[in-house]
């Protein structure tokens, strides 16, 4: 199941909820991976995939599976640590460093780890800046 969001006909977001849900049977997770692979391969206008990672948990095996897939099919991705208000500043520094060290091996990985908290509205402006930058880059390349 993929949820689609159209934002002012300028930005189209797709949400793949549950791909990392650990309690799902392996057969279901395999179906999700195949669905995602087909979706990502057939999207020529796909600029970047944002992988949301719970800062309390860090990168899970399912996240690595997704990163491997995106790297193989050459789709850029960037990690966003979520729920950063639920951990200490020391733990946040550690999970950020760990996430960066785990993702830098992927050629398709964007080298900046974003941080956010929807409850405290932390990092939302930075995510908006990132999306605006992507939109501006795409608009420039379409004009050329």
Report residues per predicted region.
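Canonical P-loop GTPase G-domain recognition
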Residues: 86-144
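Conserved beta-strand segments that form the floor/walls of ligand-binding pockets within enzyme
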Residues: 6, 51, 114
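Conserved C-terminal guanine-recognition region of P-loop GTPase G domains, centered on the G4
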Residues: 33-111
């Amino acid at each position: 199941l993929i949820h689609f969001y159209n934002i002012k006909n300028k930005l189209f977001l797709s949400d793949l909820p549950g791909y990392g849900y650990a309690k799902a049977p392996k057969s279901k997770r395999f179906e999700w991976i195949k669905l995602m692979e087909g979706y990502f391969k057939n999207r020529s206008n796909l600029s970047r995939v944002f992988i949301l990672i719970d800062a309390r948990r860090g990168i899970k095996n399912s996240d690595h599976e997704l990163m491997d897939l995106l790297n193989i099919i050459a789709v850029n991705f960037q990690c966003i640590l979520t729920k950063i208000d639920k951990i200490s500043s020391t733990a946040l520094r550690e999970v950020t460093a760990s996430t960066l060290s785990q993702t830098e091996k992927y050629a398709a990985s964007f080298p900046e780890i974003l941080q956010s908290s929807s409850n405290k509205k932390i990092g939302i402006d930075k995510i908006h800046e990132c999306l605006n930058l992507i939109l501006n880059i795409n608009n420039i390349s379409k004009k050329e």
